[in-house]
Design a protein with these regions (language model features):
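Tandem repeat scaffolds
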Residues: 2-9, 13-161
Length: 161
């Protein structure tokens, strides 16, 4: 009886895999509402990861792939996000004070209520990133450089006059 059941199960699994049905993909990392001060997430594939309301002060996320990630309300004081891919990421209500965004690609990210204070944005690409006028004005005051990935000027990507 057990052999018959095992054989039937094996046959069903073989049939499913031959039809293109695969096991479920691993879920994206979720570290929301965590204290991650000084954490090292550099050069990692963090696509779709969730860092909502996490404290990432002094964290190193440089060179990481954060496409589609959610950093809603994250505290990113003095964090290193240089060279990160933040396309289509949610940054709304994040606090970026002293944050390094050099050469980051933020194209299509949502950052309307994000606070940018004393940030480094040399070479960052902000194409199609909605943000408040006061934040845009402060970023335009320090915008310079060309993004090495997209070839866009930081000033142009922000729409600075």
């Amino acid at each position: 009886m057990q052999r018959r059941l095992a054989a039937t199960l094996a046959s069903c699994l073989l049939l499913l895999f031959s039809l293109g049905v695969s096991p479920p993909a691993q879920a994206a990392m979720d570290v929301g509402k965590q204290v991650l001060i000084g954490a090292d997430y550099s050069n990692k594939d963090l696509q779709g990861a969730t860092f909502n309301l996490s404290n990432l002060r002094e964290a190193n996320l440089s060179g990481s792939d954060l496409r589609g990630a959610s950093l809603y309300g994250a505290k990113l004081q003095d964090a290193d996000l240089s060279g990160t891919d933040l396309r289509e990421a949610t940054l709304d209500s994040a606090v970026m004070t002293g944050t390094n965004l050099s050469d980051a690609v933020l194209e299509g990210a949502f950052a309307f209520n994000t606070r940018f204070t004393d940030v480094t944005i040399t070479g960052a690409d902000f194409t199609d990133v909605p943000m408040r006028g006061d934040q845009l004005k402060s970023l335009c005051a320090v915008a310079d450089g060309i993004n090495p990935v997209t070839g866009r000027s930081t000033r142009d990507s922000l729409g600075c006059a």
